[in-house]
């Protein structure tokens, strides 16, 4: 009897070791953008992406079929639905910025990707492996793309390396073209046409591409999406105005109709532009920042960037990463901010 019990104990111990080993080998640990170590399945098949901008990264990396949850905003992005029409059928378990936890859990995600701290906390409380992919500059963009690729696995890391190299090359191309340029136009970046006094200041990714493109931010205050007065904008009197999340035609119309702002130099000289919008707006947290740096430099310094054909650049990018052949007309619509 003692011998039997001893054998049983050995068997149970061995089974426990094998089970623990199998469990360990079925998961892996990734470090998110905040340094948090998150344990996720070795093979990720189901992704809940609660950060609008990162859905585009998943699409670019070839992981769209793994999306089981997205956001309502992403489902309304025209060019995203054109390039990846399956997105309209993906669940969107959000009410405003609030997670509908039960609905999120129902999607059975292997991993949740987010950027909002409150959402991340809620998701982790629901025992869902949750990764923070947030970034605030171009270096962070590259790291976030690499992180997302590592989560997705498969061919995604190779695509991420290709993309990061292209982003670096485009930045270097702009620097090369502008190295002898002496003018530095002042640029005002307005968040959207709904509130013309909400702008982007220093220490932002917007400020970073303005500088890369050979411009100077007209706003000296720091941070994203800050409110300023019409008087402050009049004092800044920018050479160029770029408005996010709208078309060039609508941006010009909105500023001309504003009695407090229609005498700004950029408005009078017709140097107002809607920021391009593709599968996601280019100006803020976007994988299409690789195109933004080229567009911004050409907008600020058309002569120095005359050899860069933006229609062709957009078409090549979409074919390479989204496997979608844009017409010249479609590329021009994206460049004009028509979404």
Language-model region placement:
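Flexible, glycine-rich surface segments
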Residues: 197-263, 269
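Extracytoplasmic substrate-binding proteins
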Residues: 120-196, 216-221, 227, 274-338
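Short helix-initiation/N-cap motifs at beta->coil->alpha
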Residues: 33-35, 90-102, 222-230
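A local structural motif
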Residues: 38-43, 82-92, 212-222
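Short helices/loops that flank or line small-molecule/ion binding pockets
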Residues: 98-108, 126, 228-237
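Structural recognition of the beta-strand scaffold that forms the well-ordered cores
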Residues: 46-50, 68-71, 111-115, 130-134, ...
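A short, structured surface patch at a secondary-structure boundary
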Residues: 49-107, 111-116
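Sec-dependent N-terminal signal peptides of Gram-positive bacterial secreted proteins and lipoproteins
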Residues: 2-23
């Amino acid at each position: 009897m003692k011998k039997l019990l001893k054998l049983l104990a050995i068997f149970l111990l061995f089974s426990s070791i094998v089970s623990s080993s199998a469990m360990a080998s079925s998961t892996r640990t990734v470090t998110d953008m905040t340094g948090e170590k998150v344990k996720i399945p070795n093979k990720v098949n189901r992704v809940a992406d609660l950060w609008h901008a990162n859905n585009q990264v998943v699409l670019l990396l070839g992981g769209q079929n793994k999306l089981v949850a997205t956001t309502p905003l992403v489902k309304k992005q025209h060019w995203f639905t054109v390039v990846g029409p399956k997105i309209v059928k993906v669940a969107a378990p959000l009410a405003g910025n609030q997670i509908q936890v039960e609905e999120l859990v129902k999607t059975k995600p292997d991993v949740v990707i987010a950027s909002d701290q409150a959402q991340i906390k809620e998701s982790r409380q629901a025992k869902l492996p949750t990764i923070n992919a947030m970034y605030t500059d171009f270096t962070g963009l590259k790291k976030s793309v690499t992180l997302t690729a590592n989560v997705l696995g498969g061919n995604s890391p190779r695509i991420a390396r290709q993309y990061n190299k292209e982003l670096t090359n485009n930045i270097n191309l702009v620097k090369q073209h502008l190295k002898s340029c002496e003018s530095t136009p002042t640029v005002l970046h307005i968040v959207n046409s709904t509130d013309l006094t909400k702008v982007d200041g220093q220490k932002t990714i917007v400020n970073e591409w303005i500088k890369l493109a050979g411009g100077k931010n007209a706003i000296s205050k720091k941070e994203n999406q800050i409110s300023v007065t019409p008087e402050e904008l009049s004092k800044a009197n920018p050479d160029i105005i770029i408005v996010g999340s709208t078309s060039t035609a609508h941006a010009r119309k909105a500023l001309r109709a504003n009695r407090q702002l229609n005498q700004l130099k950029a408005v009078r000289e017709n140097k107002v532009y809607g920021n391009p919008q593709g599968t996601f707006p280019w100006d803020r947290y976007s994988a299409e920042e690789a195109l933004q740096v080229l567009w911004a430099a050409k907008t600020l310094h058309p002569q120095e960037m005359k050899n860069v054909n933006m229609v062709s650049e957009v078409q090549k990018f979409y074919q390479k990463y989204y496997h979608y052949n844009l017409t010249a007309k479609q590329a021009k619509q994206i460049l004009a901010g028509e979404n």
